[in-house]
């Protein structure tokens, strides 16, 4: 009926085991698992790094906004010539 039955999958699995052997398949599975684990670790470390950078950027913006010194103009008025005499 067009689909692959369980018996066909078992026959394919048996042929693969006979061709490659269990040791080769075990090492291949371990390598594949290690690759998937490494990929997940890389993705999570990239997300952590991006979150850390976003937090630092937000903190620096907040610090810059609150730490802006207010400049007060303290102009010294020149003394007039009349007062000096």
UniProtKB/Swiss-Prot annotation:
The keyword Secreted does not apply. Keywords: Cell inner membrane, Cell membrane, Membrane, Protein transport, Translocation, Transmembrane, Transmembrane helix, Transport. Residues 46-57, 74-85 have a biased composition (Basic and acidic residues). This is Sec-independent protein translocase protein TatA. GO terms for biological process: protein transport by the Tat complex. It comes from Shewanella sp. (strain ANA-3). Residues 43-85 are annotated as: Disordered. Part of the twin-arginine translocation (Tat) system that transports large folded proteins containing a characteristic twin-arginine motif in their signal peptide across membranes. TatA could form the protein-conducting channel of the Tat system. One of its GO terms (cellular component) is TAT protein transport complex.
């Amino acid at each position: 009926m067009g689909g692959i039955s369980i018996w066909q999958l078992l026959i394919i699995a048996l042929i693969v085991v006979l061709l490659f052997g269990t040791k080769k398949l075990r090492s291949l599975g371990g390598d594949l698992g290690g690759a998937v684990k490494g990929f997940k670790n890389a993705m999570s470390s990239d997300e952590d790094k991006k979150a850390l950078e976003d937090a630092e950027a937000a903190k620096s913006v907040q610090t810059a906004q609150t730490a802006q010194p207010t400049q007060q103009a303290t102009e010294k008025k020149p003394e007039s010539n009349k007062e000096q005499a």
